[in-house]
């Protein structure tokens, strides 16, 4: 299984999820590289399992002006995971079906409780028609080749 975090660059910048604690420095370095000096506006937290959320506090230390986007259950869990983290004035609580406009990208949040944990939500980017699926559709193991390589081979 691979654990991915994504950056959506538009008029506003959103980072989708964080990564496992074992990859903190590598991940923060890659995020900084992709941002190229820009500051993220939002950190979208779809799932609080540590392999997705372990670096929320580290991210907020690196980018303290970022707003965290999550649902009520996620924020409750976050407060228990990161007891010393102060998100006062930095929370954007979403309900099922809410949207967030980044510019041309519009994100829609869909709750998916018990896909894995009770707070899970997925995020649909209607511009690129991409579903950020948290732990949905996950599979352990790794492909020997990339998915795009497989699809290219199938269409020939």
Locate predicted features:
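Metallo-beta-lactamase
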Residues: 70-120
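Active-site environment of divalent metal-dependent phosphoester hydrolases
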Residues: 48-53, 76-77, 116-117, 138-141
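Conserved small/polar residues in nucleotide/adenosyl-binding loops
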Residues: 148-155
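Conserved beta-strand hairpin/beta-sheet module of binuclear metal-dependent hydrolase folds
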Residues: 1-35, 122-125, 129-133
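Short, solvent-exposed beta-strand-terminating loops
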Residues: 131-147
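Well-ordered beta-strand scaffold positions
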Residues: 11-13, 98, 105-107, 128, ...
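Divalent metal-coordination and catalytic microenvironments
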Residues: 47-49, 123, 135
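Active-site metal-binding motif and surrounding structural segment of the metallo-beta-lactamase
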Residues: 11, 22-69
